[in-house]
UniProtKB/Swiss-Prot annotation:
Organism: Arabidopsis thaliana
Presence of the UniProt keyword Ribonucleoprotein in the record: no
Domain of life, per lineage: Eukaryota
Segments of skewed composition (Low complexity): 1-16
Alphabetical list of InterPro entries matching this protein: AhpC/TSA, Peroxiredoxin, Peroxiredoxin_C, Thioredoxin-like_sf, Thioredoxin_domain
Protein name, UniProt field: 2-Cys peroxiredoxin BAS1, chloroplastic
Gene from which the chain derives: BAS1
GO molecular function annotations of the record: peroxidase activity; peroxiredoxin activity; salicylic acid binding; thioredoxin-dependent peroxiredoxin activity
Length: 266
């Protein structure tokens, strides 16, 4: 975990965003990447996924899995907490994941490095759609192993020059690599993170995760759709969402007989 000794206080804003107090640091310096290679395999996360999960047995069958290994970043487990420095609105702040519990959903995504190629296309795409995530009571957090100084230099670089421009959410600095490691996305021999993305609900539980190799960008549309489906089934626990489900479309009852209502309509 990336621990910080100083205490934090939340900042109130018109959009009710949960960011801790700003910290003061010196002027930025820039780190540039010249080459980036893809790993042959990532064993750190796969080893934990060998464990099988079990459905809870109640009077009404639950289709929400509770993972058995609490120390792994598995769907159904609590997300590993962290506190770290970040850049937001061209200033330095502290972000603590557990501050969002009981308040917001979180889209937490990892990317390899600043000043690279696929990364700015993803980061700016999430920023451009941030107002849609806000309407779903969701905060977006980006993470890489770069310093806050590198993050700041990148947001101060124009998009047409490969920069980010102003972003609508924080970029977190994981210089110790502890956050990437705790979420199982760290490529140990390269010291950078795979493109991991986690949807964390208001209880701090991981409800969705994807991991892409370095050369494959992620879809904001699919992230949004998955988030909407998650929120729907949490509000309607007697229903499940079929493939490609979008808000307004027909859901399904997870029952051998009642599900026929859905299948007969398609």
């Amino acid at each position: 975990m990336a621990s910080v000794a100083s205490s934090t206080t939340l900042i109130s804003s018109p959009s009710s965003r949960v960011f801790p107090a700003k910290s003061s640091l010196s002027s930025p310096s820039v780190s540039f990447l010249r080459t980036l290679s893809s790993p042959s395999a990532s064993a750190s996360l796969r080893s934990g996924f060998a464990r099988r999960s079990s459905l809870s047995s109640t009077s009404r069958r639950s289709f929400a899995v509770k993972a058995q290994a609490d120390d792994l970043p598995l769907v159904g487990n609590k997300a590993p907490d962290f506190e770290a420095e970040a850049v937001f609105d061209q200033e330095f702040i502290k972000v603590k994941l557990s501050d969002y519990i009981g308040k917001k959903y979180v889209i937490l995504f990892f990317y390899p490095l600043d000043f690279t190629f696929v990364c700015p296309t993803e980061i700016t795409a999430f920023s451009d759609r941030h107002s849609e995530f806000e309407k779903l009571n969701t905060e977006v957090l980006g993470v890489s192993v770069d310093s806050v100084f590198s993050h700041l230099a990148w947001v101060q670089t124009d998009r047409k020059s490969g920069g980010l421009g102003d972003l609508n959410y924080p970029l977190i600095s994981d210089v110790t690599k502890s956050i990437s490691k705790s979420f199982g996305v760290l490529i140990h021999d390269q010291g950078i993170a795979l493109r991991g993305l986690f949807i964390i609900d208001k209880e701090g539980v991981i409800q969705h995760s994807t991991i892409n190799n370095l050369g494959i960008g992620r879809s904001v549309d699919e992230t949004m759709r998955t988030l909407q489906a998650l929120q729907y089934i949490q509000e309607n626990p007697d229903e499940v969402c079929p493939a490609g489900w979008k808000p307004g479309e027909k859901s399904m009852k997870p029952d051998p007989k009642l599900s026929k209502e859905y299948f007969s309509a398609i």
